[in-house]
Amino acid sequence: MALTQAQQDIRDEFIQVHGAWGDAWERILELDAGFLRAYLNWAAVPARRRALEPKVRELVLVAVDAAATHLHAPGIRQHVRSALDLGASAAELTEVLELTGTLGIHACNVGVPLLIEVLAEEGLRSGPAQLTERQQALKAQFIDSRGYWHESWDGMLELDPELFAAYLDFSALPWRSGVLEPKVKEFIYIAFDASATHLYAPGLKLHMRNAVRLGATTAEILEVLELASLVGVHAATVAAPILAEELRVSGGS
């Protein structure tokens, strides 16, 4: 389908802002150019804010798309490619995936405190047990490697020190040998905690605080949130090509 001049202008501006174009955007442009224009204006805000360096912006978008709650493969590929084009190393991108891979522990961060509540309500628990020497050592090791402690870890450390120890080893790896600066690591956590597919408020506040204490600016954190907010457009990028195909099959318009 030949584009109108207005559609071509939107396409050209989109490529200028985002540096990429694809079939999904083409189908959206054909179906509703006004929608794509409105999205472009929205998405251009973080792109033009430039509080984050371009490479870090792409790393944040990789985390949003690669999170277990989203797993948006087309976006992962696009933003991995863009990050590489902007000079990201294999080690940096691998570290983003390692940091993003910790999301699953929130099953325990949310679930263990609820389990403790149920045990107390059922008369099976009178209060927290005193930590053993091993548990105290694990807590100290966590603080040393991660630089913080949060009450959400208390129950897991008490009830399941084996899992806590294994998770500590898993989650501390990028902090021991990673190449991203600490505040950028925190941006990755903020990105997937803030995403509409997760919305994990306790972790979001914790990692915002960590980032601020590591020197992050308000503008940087706002830009991470702005980037995470764009995830909703994947409703259109996934479905618009399907809609266009079904319209062709049915002869609709």
Region annotations inferred by a language model:
Residues 72-91, 200-220:
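Mid-chain, well-packed structural core segment of small domains
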Residues 94-113:
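Hydrophobic, ordered structural segments
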Residues 57-72, 184-200:
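Amphipathic, charged-and-aliphatic alpha-helical interface segments
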Residues 54-59, 90-95, 182-187, 219-223:
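Alpha-helical scaffolds flanking conserved acidic
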Residues 1-56, 85, 108-184, 213, ...:
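Acidic, glycine/proline-rich low-complexity segments that act as flexible tails and inter-domain linkers
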Residues 68-74, 104-108, 196-202, 233-236:
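Short helix-coil transition sites and intra-membrane helix breaks within transmembrane domains
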